[in-house]
């Protein structure tokens, strides 16, 4: 199986590559569109800022390319947010794969800190990504923006308000949390993605 990780102006590529190696998978980290198109699975990671990253994707033509991929694609954190229609982070149009917007957390109480950083459980698991997953397992989040619950929600969690922990539409899967930093539970999610 050929697995490719999209290389672009964003962080956490190394931790995704390391998580794949722990599963015995040698992935290619690349921005080469032909290599990405030929891969069996594509991972679209991201840590960074939506406006700057979308600008980079547009300049490289990667914005249209990602939307045209037909194999299973997994967006992680910022990767998930960029798959949405619009982000309040920089008020930028995104890829529009998921017809929903990314919003900034608005804390109602002093103890509700932004960013949402740390371990949380997820529920309403509606995707093969979560095969063998139980409600009491924790995954790791680091984000200041969220995607509201919608028809594309494949898993949800609650911090300040309920929101989408994962999205799914056709061949596109996405997690707001970092499976590559979520221990055994996260490894199982990556393994499930590779088995799709």
Swiss-Prot record:
<keyword id="KW-0315">Glutamine amidotransferase</keyword>
<dbReference type="Pfam" id="PF00117">
    <property type="entry name" value="GATase"/>
</dbReference>
<comment type="pathway">
    <text>Amino-acid biosynthesis; L-histidine biosynthesis; L-histidine from 5-phospho-alpha-D-ribose 1-diphosphate: step 5/9.</text>
</comment>
<dbReference type="GO" id="GO:0016829">
    <property type="term" value="F:lyase activity"/>
</dbReference>
<dbReference type="InterPro" id="IPR017926">
    <property type="entry name" value="GATASE"/>
</dbReference>
<comment type="function">
    <text>IGPS catalyzes the conversion of PRFAR and glutamine to IGP, AICAR and glutamate. The HisH subunit catalyzes the hydrolysis of glutamine to glutamate and ammonia as part of the synthesis of IGP and AICAR. The resulting ammonia molecule is channeled to the active site of HisF.</text>
</comment>
<dbReference type="InterPro" id="IPR010139">
    <property type="entry name" value="Imidazole-glycPsynth_HisH"/>
</dbReference>
<keyword id="KW-0456">Lyase</keyword>
<feature type="active site">
    <location>
        <position position="180"/>
    </location>
</feature>
<dbReference type="GO" id="GO:0000105">
    <property type="term" value="P:L-histidine biosynthetic process"/>
</dbReference>
<feature type="active site" description="Nucleophile">
    <location>
        <position position="77"/>
    </location>
</feature>
<keyword id="KW-0028">Amino-acid biosynthesis</keyword>
<keyword id="KW-0378">Hydrolase</keyword>
<keyword id="KW-0368">Histidine biosynthesis</keyword>
<keyword id="KW-0963">Cytoplasm</keyword>
<comment type="subunit">
    <text>Heterodimer of HisH and HisF.</text>
</comment>
<feature type="domain" description="Glutamine amidotransferase type-1">
    <location>
        <begin position="2"/>
        <end position="196"/>
    </location>
</feature>
<dbReference type="GO" id="GO:0000107">
    <property type="term" value="F:imidazoleglycerol-phosphate synthase activity"/>
</dbReference>
<dbReference type="GO" id="GO:0004359">
    <property type="term" value="F:glutaminase activity"/>
</dbReference>
<protein>
    <recommendedName>
        <fullName>Imidazole glycerol phosphate synthase subunit HisH</fullName>
        <ecNumber>4.3.2.10</ecNumber>
        <ecNumber>3.5.1.2</ecNumber>
    </recommendedName>
</protein>
<dbReference type="InterPro" id="IPR029062">
    <property type="entry name" value="Class_I_gatase-like"/>
</dbReference>
<feature type="active site">
    <location>
        <position position="178"/>
    </location>
</feature>
<dbReference type="GO" id="GO:0005737">
    <property type="term" value="C:cytoplasm"/>
</dbReference>
